[in-house]
């Protein structure tokens, strides 16, 4: 008889790699030999911030970089849990949540009370429910109701749970860097990672949410919708433990799991529905539809989490899948991409940021077209805030994708790995790509802007009949209208038992809650056609800048050795007629401004369109009255209309907010304009000017024998641009925030 030795379990961690040292952490710049020496000039503090998280500059070991990123992720999660915990704590301690639950259409959500130090209590408005506070627009009240939270105690407990999770995350971050640090092969085991993330995070995550919705949220929301007082609703565990209690609300519970195992699944159609449309009581998606959706998603992801080959020799191999992708025109196709994505975290991050950013923008649009939570659709300030928020997040992620793709090109790109594959072929015909994209941008910009200029001119000359408008020369968005019609009619054939189309934005009825419009068909016309082409123009220009930055990150005709200069450098000397703003970093810098341009027009379009054509009230006899009375179609077709009827007309609330509970927005509007203007000082002025000024100030200090030990230095060119764009965006975003909220809280 022969004995086979058992296969040893693979150890994928190293023990006690980095000692835990508070002395080391207390030393600023401990990660860099030059920074650890301490400051000689004021540039030191800038370099400290620039390099603290640039792990590539700390070490050349990919394993060590991977461990630092992994550990930092736990730190990030800890911060998120603390932040969430604070949100829930405010809901428990400083809010009118329970009052709002009993009258969500009449009471405004508030979870913040301003302390009266020097008269700030003016900001505490009468929001209803016996509460004086600031109206919040985060949508958390609606989310809590959908979760089945009915009292402050549940919010307190969840807040404590968040702090507990934060502590766990901080511990995990320390443990997996100092005590048991994963080896590089663990980080590069993509099949195992895919299986765990798909089946664990997305599959079991969706399944547990579906379970919570079915066993806790559905019964509680059904009782709330029926008008039962929050204080009389049974506690969540009673619904879970007492089947009879559930069966009163959802009869299929009486049958237990028998229908599941006998495949008689239609018995569960009272908890897992396919109604479509919105609930007429809450104006949100049917929660039974949402539970069904999460159950289906869970099944899909649990299957997906078993698709990739690990220890059992069955399933997909990512490397094989990628290398099989060879088209007739793509040479070696995706060969080499596996090596890129397992050795360059910048390349990996670039793809993930592009995906996540696009997803955030998709979420922004679904939140109003298919509002997921009860009473969200009629809370106009929250709807506007959620749209704006998800658009900004998406824009920043997509620009970040351009940034990290360019860093990959500069730091991690290998010409031997990328021979004649899709990336190499993109780089080899980059001139054709960029010049064509540039032509598209000029075409879109000239024509879309030209339509507006034409209309402004005709209106100024009093020739309304010669304008592009719904009442003169029509430019109807026929393709969009066709898609709307298909989506309105199709469910009648594809989902015969559904009550309504997926979104009322396409067509069908007007949904009202109380007398407020939750959602209704969004009619598209000439004004939408015109502004959509401005969207196309700004998106293409942003793409042009970012893509040019990536494709020319390593070299160009102007600077053949660009890769040697690094990711960020101000210029390559004064020759060749000037070489400024050619670094990959500068393309990201310029791309941020166009991202801001693009998104400003998107959120302005959304804000005005919804106020003009969707949001408003319905009288008892069915007459619809919109906030701005449908003025979008005739006003948004000229530049003057945008300036006069949107920006100026709707700024009256923020400009006249002084002395009211909205006065903070008036001050923010003013202050944010100042921050924005302050940015121009950094963007329109050269470094030499400031260095000269500093030297004359230092001379005066020397005369008085009060010269500092740390020599002052002007910001470098790149630092100045970074400070400039940061204040430009911060000022612009905060100005928009104040403008939007003062307006919509006053009229919405």
Swiss-Prot record:
SUPFAM superfamilies named among the record's database cross-references: Photosystem I subunits PsaA/PsaB
A molecular function (GO) term: electron transfer activity
Binding site for chlorophyll a: 681, 689
Enzyme Commission code(s) on record: 1.97.1.12
Binding site for [4Fe-4S] cluster: 571, 580
Binding site for phylloquinone: 690
Cofactor note: P700 is a chlorophyll a/chlorophyll a' dimer, A0 is one or more chlorophyll a, A1 is one or both phylloquinones and FX is a shared 4Fe-4S iron-sulfur center.
Source superkingdom: Eukaryota
Subcellular location: Plastid, Chloroplast thylakoid membrane
InterPro entries attached to this UniProt entry: PSI_PsaA, PSI_PsaA/B, PSI_PsaA/B_CS, PSI_PsaA/B_sf
GO CC terms in record: chloroplast thylakoid membrane; photosystem I
S-S bonds: none
Parts of the chain that traverse the membrane: 69-92, 155-178, 194-218, 290-308, 345-368, 384-410, 432-454, 529-547, 587-608, 662-684, 722-742
Primary localization class, coarse: plastid
EC supergroup of this enzyme: oxidoreductase
Keywords: 4Fe-4S, Chlorophyll, Chloroplast, Chromophore, Electron transport, Iron, Iron-sulfur, Magnesium, Membrane, Metal-binding, Oxidoreductase, Photosynthesis, Photosystem I, Plastid, Thylakoid, Transmembrane, Transmembrane helix, Transport
Binding residues for chlorophyll a': 673
PANTHER family noted in UniProt: OUTER MEMBRANE PROTEIN, OMPA-RELATED, PHOTOSYSTEM I P700 CHLOROPHYLL A APOPROTEIN A1-RELATED
Its biological purpose: PsaA and PsaB bind P700, the primary electron donor of photosystem I (PSI), as well as the electron acceptors A0, A1 and FX. PSI is a plastocyanin/cytochrome c6-ferredoxin oxidoreductase, converting photonic excitation into a charge separation, which transfers an electron from the donor P700 chlorophyll pair to the spectroscopically characterized acceptors A0, A1, FX, FA and FB in turn. Oxidized P700 is reduced on the lumenal side of the thylakoid membrane by plastocyanin or cytochrome c6.
Subunit structure: The PsaA/B heterodimer binds the P700 chlorophyll special pair and subsequent electron acceptors. PSI consists of a core antenna complex that captures photons, and an electron transfer chain that converts photonic excitation into a charge separation. The eukaryotic PSI reaction center is composed of at least 11 subunits.
Protein family membership: Belongs to the PsaA/PsaB family.
Name of the featured protein: Photosystem I P700 chlorophyll a apoprotein A1
């Amino acid at each position: 008889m022969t004995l086979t030795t058992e296969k040893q379990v693979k150890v994928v961690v190293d023990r006690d790699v980095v000692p835990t040292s508070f002395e080391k952490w207390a030393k600023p710049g401990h990660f860099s030999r030059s920074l650890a020496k301490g400051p000689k000039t004021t540039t030191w503090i800038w370099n400290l911030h620039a390099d603290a998280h640039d792990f590539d500059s700390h070490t050349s070991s990919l394993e060590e970089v991977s461990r630092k990123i992994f550990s930092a992720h736990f730190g990030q999660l800890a911060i998120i849990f603390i932040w969430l915990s604070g949100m829930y704590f405010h809901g428990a301690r400083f809010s009118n949540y329970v009052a709002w639950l009993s009258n969500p259409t009449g009471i405004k959500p508030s979870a913040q009370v301003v302390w009266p130090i020097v008269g700030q209590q003016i900001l505490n408005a009468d929001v209803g429910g016996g509460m004086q506070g600031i109206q919040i627009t985060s949508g958390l009240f609606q989310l809590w109701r959908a979760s089945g939270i009915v009292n402050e105690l549940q919010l307190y407990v969840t807040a404590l749970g968040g702090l507990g999770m934060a502590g766990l995350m901080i511990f995990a971050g320390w443990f997996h860097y100092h005590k048991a640090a994963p080896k590089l092969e663990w980080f590069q085991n993509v099949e195992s990672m895919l299986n765990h993330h798909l089946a664990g995070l997305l599959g079991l995550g969706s399944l547990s949410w579906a379970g919570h919705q079915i066993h806790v949220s559905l019964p509680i929301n059904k009782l709330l919708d029926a008008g039962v007082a929050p204080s009389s609703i049974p506690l969540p565990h009673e619904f879970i433990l007492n089947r009879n209690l559930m069966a009163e609300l959802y009869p299929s519970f009486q049958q237990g799991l028998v229908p599941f195992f006998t495949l008689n699944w239609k018995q569960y159609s009272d908890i897992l529905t396919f109604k479509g449309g919105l609930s007429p009581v809450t104006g949100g998606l049917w929660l039974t539809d949402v539970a069904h959706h999460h159950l289906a998603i869970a099944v899909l992801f649990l299957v997906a989490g078993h698709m990739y080959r690990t220890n059992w020799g069955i399933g997909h191999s990512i490397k094989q899948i990628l290398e099989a992708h060879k088209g007739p025109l793509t040479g070696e196709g995706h060969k080499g991409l596996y090596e890129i994505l397992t050795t360059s975290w910048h390349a990996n991050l670039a793809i993930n940021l592009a995906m996540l950013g696009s997803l955030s923008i998709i979420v922004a649009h679904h939140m109003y077209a298919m509002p997921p939570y009860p009473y969200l659709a009629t809370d106009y300030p929250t709807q506007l805030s959620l749209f704006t928020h998800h658009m900004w997040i998406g824009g920043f992620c997509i620009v970040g994708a351009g940034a990290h793709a360019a860093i990959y090109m500069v730091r991690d790109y290998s010409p031997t790995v990328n021979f004649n594959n899709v990336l190499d072929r993109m780089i080899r015909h980059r001139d054709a790509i960029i010049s064509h994209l540039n032509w598209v941008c000029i075409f879109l910009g000239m024509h879309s802007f030209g339509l507006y200029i034409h209309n402004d001119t005709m209106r100024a000359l009093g020739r309304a009949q010669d304008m592009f408008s719904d009442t003169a020369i029509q430019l109807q968005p026929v393709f969009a209208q066709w898609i709307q019609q298909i989506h309105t009619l199709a469910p009648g054939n594809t989902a015969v038992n559904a009550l309504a189309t997926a979104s009322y934005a396409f067509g069908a009825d007007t949904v009202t809650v109380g007398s407020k419009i939750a959602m209704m068909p969004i009619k598209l016309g000439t004004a939408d056609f015109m502004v959509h082409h401005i969207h196309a123009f700004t998106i293409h220009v942003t793409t042009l800048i970012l893509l040019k930055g990536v494709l020319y990150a390593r070299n160009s005709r102007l600077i053949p050795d660009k890769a040697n200069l690094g990711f960020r450098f101000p210029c390559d000397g004064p020759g060749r007629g000037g070489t400024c703003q050619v670094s990959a970093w500068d393309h990201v810098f310029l791309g941020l401004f166009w991202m801001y341009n693009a998104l400003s027009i998107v959120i302005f379009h959304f804000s005005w369109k919804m106020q003009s054509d969707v949001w408003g009230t319905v009288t008892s006899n069915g007459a619809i009255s919109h906030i701005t009375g449908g003025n979008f179609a005739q006003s948004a077709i000229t530049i003057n209309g945008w300036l006069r009827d949107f920006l100026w007309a709707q700024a009256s609330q923020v400009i006249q907010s002084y002395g009211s509970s909205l006065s903070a927005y008036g001050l923010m509007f003013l202050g944010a304009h100042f921050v924005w203007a302050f940015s121009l000082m950094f963007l329109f002025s050269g470094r030499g000017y400031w260095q000269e000024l500093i030297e004359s100030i230092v001379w005066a200090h020397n005369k008085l024998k009060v010269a500092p030990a740390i020599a002052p230095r002007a910001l470098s060119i790149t630092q100045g641009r970074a400070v400039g764009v940061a204040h430009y965006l911060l000022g612009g975003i905060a100005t928009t925030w104040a403008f939007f909220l003062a307006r919509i809280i006053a009229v919405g």
